[in-house]
Amino acid sequence: SPASQSLPRELSLSNDYELLQRFVPELEQLRIEEEDEDDTGSLQIEVLATFEWEEGHAPSETFGVSVLNGTQLIGVNCSGTFEESPCMGFAGDSAMGPILPVETNSVTVHIIVDHQIIESIFNNRTAMVTYATPSSETQTAVSLFGTTNLKSSSIQTWKLRDANNF
């Protein structure tokens, strides 16, 4: 089911009693060190992207991260046309949820891609699991999109090892 949780998460409460979630730190052990990497790309990758805009000036353009060479877009739409929140996070065409806290002027999205399964967590609050079919094993590019009107944006990526290679 698209709402399933396949990777372990650590749950906690914010000072305002909001449920927070993040991938468990043990998953970092799957990261491949840079000196061990080759440049062939990977269908198993971890992405940490941060976006910031001027306070009170939410961007009118959709922005976010493109994974699997554009097969899947994970991003934020701040058009303000949503009842739940001025900004909504989305993953592909099938998943959408509010960017919280509501008055924020930044978004951090943590993504783990495991072949066709893509898990995304926005601001340690809103999580989504989506599925995408890459056109080939070489279509692995990761990039930011829609960042021209933002104050700042950054991205970190790590290729990942197999967790259960029996």
What are these regions, as identified by a protein language model?
Residues S1-F166:
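Beta-rich accessory regions
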